[in-house]
Amino acid sequence: MRVVYEPESETYRGEKYDFIYISFCDDEGESYTTTESDGIWLSQVTNQYRAKHAIPYTDEIIALRERYGLSASKMSVILGFGANQYRLYEMGEVPSESNGKMIRSVMNPKVFLDLVNSSRHELTDREYDKIVARMEEVIAQSDEWHSERWTVDRLFRSGRGVANGFAPLSTARLKNLLLYILGKMGDTFQTKMNKVLFYIDFLSYRERGMAISGLAYNAIDFGPVPQRWDRVYSAFDEVEQQTKLVHDQECVALTATAAADMGGFTIEEKAIIDEVCEKMKSLSAHDISDLSHREPAWKNHLHQSETIPYSEAFSLVGV
């Protein structure tokens, strides 16, 4: 069986989007697709649509409801949607532009509280009091939320969208990803970690239509590197940096001082991380750098100012 990747385009809600179409060719020359491969190309299209129109992603829609401590049906009532609409959005349906903007706006808890007050006639007194109390708690915690957003802006140069493979921007996920890699591979030089993260993200995009770390990458002389990699590796107390002398050169190794909490990662994400770590664990920093130099993702974008496009995931040779 041979996997075939072909550039295609699709009109979605009146707009044309480019994507990579995935099919399989058997020994008799017959081509076919699977539910999974069709899902990957559809994700490429719908994620571009979400990014273009600032429509929240599925994980953001779920996280918003959980932050406010409400059921999906109650969110629909307060937002003025159909009874099951919010639940459908949590299952992957893409909101309309107007509903997407509504969901985006109520990520501000004060805006949501105004809507709760406007919907009071549709809530029991007990429901109303409980929701208001929760929203007051959320608003009181806004300083903590703004601190997290400041850290996100500091670590992730590119916002969520095409440049970062549509991955969530989360410092907790990034920290635990680093800790997990170090737990699997042991102390790891920064130069090697750069390539490991690249392969994890680009393999994830190829297999799922979405990256994992939230990072975007540039192609420099020594291979693909995450944007702001120096800030990333110094951002977490649980990731220590140690200078070591290797062949008369000072190199910085990363060491984990805590165990990773992988509760925020899916089974599919963890399987991809494990696959890359297993393949790269025995490679030296020099070996993995040489491997990355075989990648069209690096060769086609060396010394260019823009980030490496995630569409290059479909030309990976190292994994």
Model-identified regions with their sequence ranges:
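N-terminal flexible/basic segments that precede or flank functional cores
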Residues: 1-53, 123-126
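Alpha-helix N-cap/N′ positions at the starts of helices
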Residues: 56-57, 81, 98, 173
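Residues in the recognition helix of alpha-helical DNA-binding motifs
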Residues: 64, 78, 89, 232
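Short alpha-helical DNA-recognition segment
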Residues: 69-85
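Recognition helix of helix-turn-helix/homeodomain-like DNA-binding domains
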Residues: 81-95
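Short, basic-rich loop-to-helix N-cap that marks the start of a DNA-contacting helix
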Residues: 93-105
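Domain-edge interaction signal
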Residues: 101, 111-319
